Amino acid sequence: MKNGRTYFAISSVIFLVVLAISPLKDFFREWKWYQYEYNDLVGGLPQRIKPADIGIKQIWARKLDRIDRCVTCHLGLKEKALVESKEPFRSHPQIYHDFEELGCTICHEG
């Protein structure tokens, strides 16, 4: 009987530790750090650029039946003030189509 209680106690503690750690996976997602870094970058610029809302961003290219989530990290695509910034925050060079309509992977292949 005592042996069964020991196993139950150990498995309960392990379960609680796993349950407590699980929400941390979302907190430490790589894309969040890119968004925090972007917000720090635009906060230090003389131009007024709206900081990014923290979260997954996507472009739904309906005509191509494709969803691109590149803009979750590549946040400065439209910002002319970021033309000299490092990747992934650099603004995109002039293109002849609206990337919000066609997305990124159609040209960049993923």
Where are each of the predicted segments found?
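Short sequence/structural segments immediately N-terminal
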Residues: 1-110
